[in-house]
A protein has these predicted regions:
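Intrinsically disordered, low-complexity cytosolic regulatory tails
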Residues: 2-49, 293-375
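Short beta-strand micro-motifs within the conserved protein kinase catalytic domain, predominantly
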Residues: 124-131, 141
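Glycine-rich ATP phosphate-binding loop
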Residues: 79-96, 122
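Regulatory alphaC helix of protein kinase catalytic domains
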Residues: 105-109
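A conserved loop-to-beta-strand element in the N-lobe of protein kinase catalytic cores
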Residues: 130-138, 146-147
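Conserved catalytic-loop aspartate of Hanks-type protein kinases
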Residues: 244
Length: 375
């Protein structure tokens, strides 16, 4: 049986990107979905999302007749849209005759319409006019994390920036699992779906495969991106919160190594698990472009956490809330160290100033001593 596993072809120009999907035969769930969302029922469901509806002509004008292309994905092309009021958005258009795209379009409208978090890419509207299926998102001006890790002509991310991105993504997924009601499992966490805004804050994107966690929700065939998919999910076809945790663990190793999960990342990580002295040699797999500018204690903490996340058995993986808390503690320790360094610098400065004051005082005393008349 052919599994609809997404491949992670990196689109260096993507700002909002799906990646290529290999389609197997339609599943029972797909048929149920298609039959349920029809005609007036579909329009009713979309209207209940509460999202603004954009007229097709307005989007056509804002994208210069859909010529300002940013990238291409399984869903269809993505365009940059500049609205008359000055706002800039990313517009994702459903490719014609795309059954998978129709499903993902409805899924994103229904799921993202009720989700709001600073570490998610917000859906700001849609168009479902005369057969057109278009999603309108916030524009992420710095593109995807994958572009920074693998794209040409990009400055390598600093270690501090990589830790911050890990913290941002963890907060976004934690919100999906524990803050949303009902909870949401993303099911396609990967570097191409982590977008960076103008301040380089990371946001989780692409909810076309995501699902709300409900007891009556049917299971589906395995979907996701090769290299990121939970092996337990592949064997059971049952997705859980821990499937997202596994994918996030792969993402952490990506941030550390800048190695593609589809090109031997985990084999490379395996070489570092035991070095000649019988200790974990995480320093050996760090991205060479960092030139050793890495906080070693943070590296070890990050790699150890990633290793727990990618445990083959889901019961041995931490929940996303625990993962997020551990990553936030790294930031607290870093800030504490920075404050301590600043305090020591201030103390050293004060001591230097105090010594200077003493010397000034001694000079003043000497200057105040009257000269003795010559005999």
């Amino acid at each position: 049986m052919q599994l609809p596993i997404r491949t992670n072809g990196i689109d260096a120009s993507s700002v909002l990107s799906d990646t290529t999907t290999e389609h197997g035969s339609p599943t029972k769930e797909n048929k149920q979905f298609s039959s349920w969302f029809r005609g007036s029922e579909k329009r009713s469901v979309l209207s209940h999302s509460g999202l603004p509806v954009y007229p097709y002509k307005d989007l056509q004008k804002a994208t210069s007749n859909f010529t300002n292309k940013l990238g291409e994905g399984a869903f269809g092309p993505v365009f940059k849209a500049i609205m008359p009021h000055g706002g800039t958005f990313a517009v994702k258009m459903l490719a014609s005759r795309s059954r998978q795209g129709e499903k993902e379009f409805l899924n994103e409208v229904l799921v993202l319409g009720r989700l709001h978090h600073r570490n998610l890419v917000n859906l700001v509207g849609y168009c479902a006019e005369k057969g057109h299926r278009i999603l309108v998102y916030e524009y992420m001006s710095n593109g995807s994390l994958a572009e920074f890790l693998y794209g040409e002509g990009r400055e390598p991310l600093s270690w501090d920036r990589r830790v911050q991105i890990a913290q941002d993504v963890a907060r976004g997924i934690e919100y999906l699992h524990d803050g949303a009601s009902p909870p949401v499992i993303h099911r396609d966490i990967k570097s191409a779906n982590i977008l960076l805004d103008g301040s380089m804050k990371a946001r989780v994107a692409d909810f076309g495969l995501s699902k709300e966690v409900r007891s009556d929700y049917p299971s589906s065939g395995v979907q996701g991106t090769y290299g990121y998919v939970d092996p337990e999910y592949i064997s059971t076809a049952q997705f859980t919160h821990k499937s997202d945790v596994y994918s996030f663990g792969i993402l952490l190793f990506e941030l550390i190594t800048a190695r593609n999960p589809q090109k031997g990342l985990m084999d490379y990580v395996g070489l570092a698990l035991l070095n000649a002295e019988g200790e974990e040699g995480w320093e050996e797999i760090v991205d060479d472009r960092l030139n050793g500018n890495v906080n070693l204690s943070e590296l070890r903490a990050l790699a150890s956490l990633a290793r727990r996340c990618v445990s083959p058995t889901s019961n041995n993986r931490p929940r996303m809330r625990e993962v997020s808390q551990q990553l936030q503690r790294l930031g607290i320790r870093r800030n504490s160290s920075r404050i301590e360094r600043n305090r020591m610098t201030v103390n050293d400065t004060l001591q230097t100033m105090s010594m200077a004051d003493v010397l000034k005082g001694d000079l003043k005393i000497l200057n105040d001593i009257p000269e003795q008349p010559e005999v």
